[in-house]
């Protein structure tokens, strides 16, 4: 913020001319300094050199404070950045009013201390409070430039901060040779999300890990079910739908051009579920409390209009508590 204020208060050299330059302070800054909001601070070459320098310096300071104040008003709560990540006990100790509007409710807890390994012995556990918090969404799509191959592109989130999956649970089996198997059974295991590509196209999907069966080692254990984002009666902008609407928008397309598969994706609507894959990695654990944290990367299809899905890559952090059976 100090760098922003310094940049805002810097005066760029200007060409000296015969016309007077003026600056009008904003109403918020004017009230703070006791200046009329409608008043103008004028710097004229007809005045004494010292008076000119003094007035111009005052005008520059006023403009700098006005710019900095406007930036704070526009940025609002984001001026301080993301909230500090709290432990599970710290979150539980806070009241509703202390959490409201801070962004903490959309975050997974972290661990204070712990070890950089997975020291849990072989056996059967119950994984509870399983939380998945995305930190980035990228969508595989063609680039803006012509003939650019499809690649995962950064997106802009269009929905509110309600995309974190939480309170999930299921059995976890720690086998010999440090292999794991986890089955997701219950919890808030899906969230509707819409993101926007750089070209303006919006992609809707359900971020989910329904019926997840993850197996592997703690460094990387991973298909899961991706329900349809929309129902079969949904109609796309051209009136095509699964159980209602047109089969094709207008006349049937002429075949033989090599684009039959692409046209079928757009025309034949399908509301059935698809599958996705996720990779979970353990980065730290706390054996005395049974807490585990890590990072994940999930690749699943989107469901913009019941077909022609795009691949969505979701990366983020996760948290869980293990209880021995």
From Swiss-Prot:
Gene Ontology terms for molecular function: oxygen evolving activity
GO CC term, one of those recorded: chloroplast thylakoid membrane
Location of this chain's protein in the cell: Plastid, Chloroplast thylakoid membrane
InterPro entries: OMP/PagP_b-brl, PsbO
Residue range covered by the transit peptide: 1-79
Keywords per UniProt: Chloroplast, Manganese, Membrane, Photosynthesis, Photosystem II, Plastid, Thylakoid, Transit peptide
One GO process term, biological-process aspect: photosystem II assembly
Domain of life: Eukaryota
Annotated spans, Disordered: 236-260
Protein task: Stabilizes the manganese cluster which is the primary site of water splitting.
Family: Belongs to the PsbO family.
Name of this chain's protein: Oxygen-evolving enhancer protein 1, chloroplastic
Provenance organism: Triticum aestivum
Classification lineage: Eukaryota, Viridiplantae, Streptophyta, Embryophyta, Tracheophyta
């Amino acid at each position: 913020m100090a760098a922003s204020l310094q940049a805002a208060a810097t005066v760029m050299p200007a060409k000296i001319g015969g016309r007077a330059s003026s600056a009008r302070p904003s109403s918020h800054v004017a009230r703070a300094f006791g200046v009329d909001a409608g008043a103008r601070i004028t710097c004229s070459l007809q005045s004494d050199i010292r008076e000119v320098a003094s007035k111009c310096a005052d005008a520059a300071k006023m403009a700098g404070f006005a710019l900095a104040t406007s930036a704070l008003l526009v940025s609002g709560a984001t001026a301080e950045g993301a909230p500090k990540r709290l432990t599970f006990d710290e979150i539980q100790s806070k009241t509703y009013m202390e959490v409201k509007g801070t962004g903490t409710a959309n975050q997974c807890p972290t661990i204070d201390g712990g070890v950089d390994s997975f020291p849990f012995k072989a056996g059967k556990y119950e994984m509870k409070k399983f939380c998945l918090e995305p930190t980035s969404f990228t969508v595989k799509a063609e680039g803006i430039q012509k003939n650019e191959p499809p690649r995962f592109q950064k997106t802009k989130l269009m929905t509110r901060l309600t995309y974190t999956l939480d309170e999930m649970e299921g059995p976890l089996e720690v086998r010999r040779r440090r292999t794991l198997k986890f089955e997701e059974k219950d919890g808030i295991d899906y969230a509707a999300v819409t993101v926007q590509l750089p070209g303006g196209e919006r992609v809707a999907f359900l971020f989910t890990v329904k019926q997840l069966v993850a197996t592997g080692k703690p460094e990387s254990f991973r298909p899961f079910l991706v329900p349809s984002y929309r129902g079969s009666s949904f109609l796309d902008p051209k009136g095509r739908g699964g159980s209602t609407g047109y089969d094709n928008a207008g006349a049937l397309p002429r075949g033989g051009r090599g684009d039959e598969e692409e046209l079928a994706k757009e025309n034949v609507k399908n509301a059935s579920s698809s599958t996705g894959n996720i990779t979970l990695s353990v980065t730290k654990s706390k054996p005395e409390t049974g807490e585990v944290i890590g990072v994940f990367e999930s690749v699943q299809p989107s469901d913009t209009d019941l077909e022609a899905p795009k691949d969505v890559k979701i990366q983020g952090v996760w948290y869980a508590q293990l209880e021995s059976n």
